[in-house]
Amino acid sequence: MQFERADRVAEEIKKEISDIIQHELKDPRICAELISIVKVNMSKDLRHAKVFVSIFDKNRENITSTMKALENAKPYIRREISRRINLRFSPEISFELDDSIEYGARISQILNQLNIAKDEEEEKSQDESEGEQEN
């Protein structure tokens, strides 16, 4: 599959934004346990970048404050992107919270609970049938 230029630029922007967030942003409002850039969607003209951010933290307030800090850091991140990547125009950045990983983990947890309940039920019925055979 041949990548379009927008896809290649999106992947490069994803790497650079991850690096900037991990190593250069010193905002105390970024207090989440783990921040991950999941995906970057670029417009065809490369002027707009929608950055999907996944934030792992049990406290909703930390997630909100981290998103506000990222919004406030947009001018700095945009400037750094233009410095690091050679593009004609520095893309306008918008951050979107992506909770799909958290949602998937929750579904996985529910499925595991169902499997545990099913296993316990099978063990109980097996124990009952063994008890009947002894009589």
UniProtKB/Swiss-Prot annotation:
It comes from Caldicellulosiruptor saccharolyticus (strain ATCC 43494 / DSM 8903 / Tp8T 6331). NCBIfam families: rbfA. Pfam families: RBFA. Coiled coil: none annotated. GO terms for biological process: maturation of SSU-rRNA. It is found in: Cytoplasm. This is Ribosome-binding factor A. Gene3D superfamilies: 3.30.300.20. Keywords: Cytoplasm, Ribosome biogenesis. GO terms for cellular component: cytosol. One of its GO terms (molecular function) is ribosomal small subunit binding. The gene is rbfA. The keyword Protein biosynthesis does not apply. The keyword Cytoplasm applies. InterPro entries: KH_dom-like_a/b, RbfA, RbfA_dom_sf, Ribosome-bd_factorA_CS. Monomer. Binds 30S ribosomal subunits, but not 50S ribosomal subunits or 70S ribosomes. Belongs to the RbfA family. One of several proteins that assist in the late maturation steps of the functional core of the 30S ribosomal subunit. Associates with free 30S ribosomal subunits (but not with 30S subunits that are part of 70S ribosomes or polysomes). Required for efficient processing of 16S rRNA. May interact with the 5'-terminal helix region of 16S rRNA. It comes from the Bacteria.
